[in-house]
Amino acid sequence: MTHRSRTQRLAMLAAAAALIAGGVPGSATAFAAPSGAPFAPAPPPVTVLAAVPAADWVRTTDPPSGISAELPGKATVRTATVPIEDQLVDGRAYGEETPDGGIGFAVHDMPGDQYPLEEDLQRFLGSYTQNTAKPLTSHDVRKLTVDGRPALDARPTSQSDGEPVTGSIRLIADDKHLVWAITLGPQANEKALNAMHEQLLAGLRIP
């Protein structure tokens, strides 16, 4: 597998895990392709775009919530509807692929404090593992507050084709939404991944 196809696959799987993780049941695997495409049990391929300078990052807005973030190019959008107790919750993930790894954010239409953020993180790890058959573990987990909202930071790590994988994730509990910001890629690109994640967080806006 080439370096580019590997990072493409990581971005796709991270987006799928973030969306599916919004649901409580471990069997919740409903995943929709971009708008207009038929439903499928697995996410569609991620479009690979060349890396662009930081000055060319594009602000991407989630229309239903108004939540936005800057991403390095035009984002690939994915949607999912996940069962939570007696209701269906809509989620959307906006991701972009770079030569260094995948980056993106996801929004679930549910109160961010409906479940502890630690449980949400565990569902993300479990969803990724379910999709890849490779364990994803979290390190350096810490609670914080972002603009008055509860948040949780962690560093996920795994393996992909024998290569170490690392990244960063932030979960934010808004009154009406659960927000994820994720960066994931080969450990060899850790410095670039950290810089991308910092820029992603700096540009994240929750109305």
Map each language-model feature to its residues.
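Sec-dependent signal peptide cleavage junction
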Residues: 25-44, 50
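A short acidic-to-branched-hydrophobic micro-motif
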Residues: 93-119
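Short, solvent-exposed coil/turn segments at beta-strand boundaries
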Residues: 98-102, 172-178
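Secretory targeting and sorting signals
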Residues: 1-34
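Second-shell loop/turn segments in exported
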Residues: 82, 108-115, 144, 184-191
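N-terminal "mature-domain start" segment
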Residues: 46-90, 198, 203-207
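Surface-exposed amphipathic alpha-helical segments
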Residues: 19, 75, 120-132, 177-207
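Signature of long, low-cysteine stretches enriched in small and polar/charged residues
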Residues: 70, 76, 80-93, 126-173
